């Protein structure tokens, strides 16, 4: 029988009680006959567990390697959003300092997170970091990048408008970027730039 279980991983958010429940079930199972996929599934069903690897060590030891999900941001300032686009209750003890703010209608967190990933992939390669992404009730998109510069994409043709922003950025037409308050791309053939303190 299994008499020893080792747990490995940097566990900040995973419920120890949830793990202990599975560990108690695992103990005294037959070493050769234990259903690893069953226990892997039970462990991966625990909040914040991204993946689990189970290794057997002869003659009676099981090693559990748990990988914790990352916190990506705050959803509507009241829930945590993980790297899989799932929401969790806000626990102040496990909240990193600089979280991206996600705003949107209830039930649309996956859409907002997917759009964030799309925009972030393009922006981060240009040295631009997203602070906030918002989808309002009308379906209008606004991205806020550091240092607190709003990029207003509106409701329609958002991909085209975002590409227009990237083109302008790539052509170095946005001088003194940090002095900009917002860039409004909701126009069919151009954009408006408002400078800070203007």
Residue ranges of predicted features:
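Short secondary-structure junctions
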Residues: 44-50, 122-129, 173-178
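Second-shell loop/turn segments in exported
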Residues: 6, 25-29, 101-109, 148-156
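Flexible glycine-/small-residue-rich
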Residues: 9-11, 56, 66-70, 104, ...
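Terminal hydrophobic membrane-targeting helix
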Residues: 1-93
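Extracytoplasmic segments of membrane-associated envelope/inner-membrane machinery
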Residues: 62-138, 143-144, 150
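Extracytoplasmic/secreted envelope proteins and their assembly/folding machinery
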Residues: 16, 20-23, 36, 40, ...
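Extracytoplasmic/luminal low-complexity segments enriched in Pro/Gly and acidic/polar residues
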Residues: 156-198
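Extracytoplasmic
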Residues: 2, 14, 47, 57-61, ...
